[in-house]
C-alpha cells in the first residue's frame, strides 16, 4: 500500500528489504512495481549478505526519509542509522493488539510523550519519540 500510494503521488521510493534467507522474502515483485528494490539476506542467498543497515546502497544514495517496519531489533538498528545520518525516520510498529481500542493496554509503547497505545495512537511513530 505504501509503495502504491507514493507512486500515485509522484514520490520516488527506494525499497531495501531484508530477511534471514531468500525464502523468507515476500511479495518481491510487488515492491519492484513501485520503486527501485534492493535486497539483503543474512545468509547471502539473495542480494547482499548481511543486514539492511549494512547494505552498500546506504553509502551510494542520500535518503530524505526512511520508513521501517519489521522485527523490533531491526527497526532499532534502522532508527540508529537514521539518527546518526540526520534522516527523518518513521517506524510502523507491530505490537500485539488485543482490543484495538486502547482499553486493554496490550500494545503500549514507551515514548517521549509517555506510554502510548499503538492501536489508537499509531501504528506509525517518529523514531525520535520512541524510547527503545
Can you say where each PLM-predicted feature lies in the sequence?
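Local cysteine-cluster metal-coordination motifs and their immediate loop/turn environment
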Residues: 1, 72-73, 94-123
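FNR/FR-type flavoprotein reductase catalytic core
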Residues: 1-91
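Short gly/pro/ser/thr-enriched loop/turn and capping motifs at secondary-structure boundaries
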Residues: 22-24, 45-46, 96-100, 125
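Short microdomains enriched in Cys/His and/or Lys/Arg
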Residues: 121-132
